[in-house]
């Protein structure tokens, strides 16, 4: 459900800027964050606590192999984990508002204050990792979205002859052409903040939980976390 909060925040320019920056007191107290959390919380409560879990591994298994979960909020990866009997019935989709969440972290970076020799080696490594050769393997073997946009994903998918890989190519195309692409907020706000939001949403899934009161409690938790 934190992905829903993430996507709703990204649906406005102000909210997107907040998600792409460190969490601040202004963000915690903003209308954008309140709206995103409460909207997700109401959806969770309507869905019911019996359909809520923080065990992502089990949730993925229920979706990929058993077909007991209707929607999985996940990145464009793990196509190989989908059971062959379910591949034809699974379709990729973006969040409402044509929003895509980039689940990658900070990417590749070169440290400051290194010697020219080390800096040159580091840049060579980045050049290699982002090369078409390596990026094709990231798509076909790692089954993730390559950062090199020159890679022809559809051609690779067709060559593979694998339906799941073809669905992966479709998912990557949707993400790459989304109207709004935003970073996963746990990389900017921190995993501890993400966990606090998830816990609050799980509590809100219980029938009768006062969402407004739980949000006020969450605000206090987050302000304490960011000090």
Regions found by a protein language model. Name each.
Residues 1-25, 69:
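Extracytoplasmic/periplasmic solute-binding protein
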Residues 22-53:
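Glycine-centered hinge/linker elements that transmit conformational signals in sensory
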Residues 50-65:
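Short helix-initiation/N-cap motifs at beta->coil->alpha
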Residues 56, 73-80:
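Beta->alpha turn/N-cap motifs
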Residues 61, 78-85, 223:
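Pocket-flanking alpha-helical
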Residues 65-74:
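Alpha-to-beta junction loops
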Residues 84-145:
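Extracytoplasmic/periplasmic substrate-recognition and gating elements
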Residues 102, 166-221:
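C-terminal capping/gating helix-and-loop segments adjacent to ligand/active sites or protein-protein/ligand interfaces
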């Amino acid at each position: 459900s934190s992905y829903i909060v993430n996507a709703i925040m990204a649906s406005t320019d102000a909210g997107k800027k907040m998600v792409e920056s460190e969490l601040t007191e202004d963000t915690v107290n903003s209308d954008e964050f309140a709206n995103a959390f409460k909207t997700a919380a109401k959806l969770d409560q309507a869905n019911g606590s019996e359909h809520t879990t923080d065990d992502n591994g089990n949730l993925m298994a229920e979706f990929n192999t058993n077909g007991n979960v209707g929607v999985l909020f996940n990145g464009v990866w793990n196509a190989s984990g989908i059971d062959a009997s379910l591949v034809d019935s699974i379709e990729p989709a973006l969040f409402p508002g044509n929003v895509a969440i980039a689940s990658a972290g900070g990417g590749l970076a070169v440290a400051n204050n290194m010697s020219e020799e080390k800096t040159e080696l580091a840049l060579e490594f980045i050049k290699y990792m982002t090369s078409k050769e390596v990026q094709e393997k990231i798509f076909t073997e790692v089954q993730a979205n390559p950062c090199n946009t020159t890679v022809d994903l559809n051609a690779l998918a067709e060559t593979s002859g694998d339906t799941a890989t073809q669905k992966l190519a479709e998912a990557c195309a949707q993400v790459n052409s989304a109207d709004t692409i935003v970073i996963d907020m746990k990389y900017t706000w921190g995993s501890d903040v993400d966990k606090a939001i998830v816990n609050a949403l799980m509590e809100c899934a219980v029938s009768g939980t006062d969402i407004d009161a739980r949000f006020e409690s969450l605000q206090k938790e987050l302000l304490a976390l960011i000090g």
